[in-house]
Amino acid sequence: MTETNAPVHNQPQPAPVKRNEVLRFVYVLNIVSCFAVVLLHTTLPVYSPQPTWHWLEMLSLQSLAIFAVPVFFMVSGMNLLGYRNRYPTSVFFRKRFWRVGKAMLLGSLACYVLFCVFPYSFYGAEQFAGVFGVVDFIKRFLTNQINDTYWFFYSIIYLYVLTPILSLVVHNRRCVEYLLVLTAAISVGLPLTERFGLNPIYVNSLLSWPLFSSVALLYFLAGYYVHTYW
């Protein structure tokens, strides 16, 4: 019997990419996106529409910089979904949860103390007047009611929890494409149909799947797919 080295499944293989080129590419993306995030946060009055040129200027700046958060999710997916080639899952959790969890907790604690001590010195902080306490902090921390701009931390932790599972299937290009199509249909397609007048009652029971309704997951997977297979 003749031996053969041909693979059993003829799956498309990831395209080789030079590491130095990847690092420069990622650095540029992160730097540009950081500036874009600052721009987004300095034009927040855009969410209070007014018929003025100043509001139109802020709207234009928001439109130019809105790519920042999707890029951060894509870069995270590009860097993390192949972590098994570098270290075990225990190291992944220890590195990622410690780094993000520490920043999230300390940042929330600092904001909570500042808002409670100076409730009338920060926009929207009046609700913190006279409520300082451990229980109140825990409740607000668990529900992202301290500094709502920290929503990114909550989203990225969700993706970290999914990463060990996703990392087992991302080496199969067809599986990644299936996940991308499914997540895009649920997280983007369904809300879009509602904008065009479709009553959500007709699709929510059948297609309201929390796992695939996350736009963050869509960008997370897309980052790995674009980097690896394009």
Residue ranges and their predicted role:
Residues M1-G189:
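Membrane-cytosol interface segments of multi-pass membrane proteins
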Residues V69-G82, Y154-S167, E194-W230:
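Specific transmembrane alpha-helix
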